[in-house]
Amino acid sequence: MAGEILRRYTQLPALFYMLSEKTLTLLDPNSWDDKNDSYFLEQYKAKRRLKTVLALCFSTAPETYHHWSIFANGSAGICVQFKRDELLAAIKGCDGVRYRNVDYMLLTTAKTKRLRTKDLPFTKRRPYISEEEWRIIYESATHEKHSQDIAFPLASISRISLSPWLPEALKNRVKESLRKIEGCSGLEISRSTLISNEQWRKMGEQAV
């Protein structure tokens, strides 16, 4: 069913840290490419008089070329699929943590509707709607932090997809390295076939 899986697109170094530490790492959004998005989070931080606002983004959408090319580009890109309910059970109740789907709004709508401060971390412009983003934020009024780790069970990972641009010759060695991490020997890991799929090609060959 839709919404049962949360996809986290990132890079191999971040994945090695995630699996080794068994944590999700929320970071400062100031480095994000979408400056409108990071500005809303800055405004939320200022209006709530917070010392820290950090975030981590997922997608509820199926695998797409757009997600790979924007969020996990290159041969070191990866996509971790999480079982939504199991991940939520792990983070629910964590101090300072909020999470929800992102709302996408037209500029014309925003001009006629005054935004609420509490919604700023989860509001983006309509052109980003294809991301189908689900977001976790961490906030603190007393502690200034540059990152925040949240523990999660490895059992909440459904599968890991390696980059479709990862050379075939490197695929098995990367899998072996990941499965050597404590607790990761049974993880389902495969290289994405998004840009080169044998079944799709065969259908072309069998066309009449």
Locate the predicted segments by residue.
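Partner-binding and oligomerization surfaces adjacent to conserved cores of proteins
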Residues: M1-V208
